[in-house]
Amino acid sequence: LKQKSLDLQIREAYLEGLSALEEGDVLFAARKFNEVELLYPQSDLAPKSSLMAAYSYYVQDYYEDCIMELDRFLKVYPKDKNLDYANYMLGIAFYEQIVDEKKDTFSIIKAKGYFEYLIQNYPNTEYAVDASFKLELIKDVLASKELYIGRYYVDKKKWIPAINRFKNVVNKYDTTIYIEEALYRLVEIHYLLGLKEEAKK
């Protein structure tokens, strides 16, 4: 009877969180989900509550809180069945913070890392398609940045750093729209330097 009463308390607290989330009171929802996990850590709903708390923060654009919650989830529940979702949401939380691709390098790299990890380790997850799509967008951003810096070095006649930047596009981002310009620039520089054999490659 006592166990039944405890199970009921856990479920009621969880449902309160869901109800608050549906009504838009996301901070209260996050608090209720955290409460379930804190007071009933052995409950089957504990890991799910942690994920729901993270989602509540995400909905409100509290990305740092969302990331902290998800990081903790991965440490506390390393064998949970929803690890794919946690890694996907980490990628999304960083992805949503990319406002200026020239400045938000940290968020770009972190999002890229989580999406790549998800696709590599959970290729059949339902989140893989969206992760792949966003990964291609991120690669476009990174390739664009490499090309921009490469052009800067060309203008300054700093050929070796320019070559390195264009090679980065060719080696790392060959599926992006910037591959053709990168190849053209490499050929152009090699001809300028008299390296015709290199240009032919």
Residue ranges and their predicted role:
Residues 1-201:
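Acidic, polar-rich low-complexity tracts and alpha-helical solenoid repeat scaffolds
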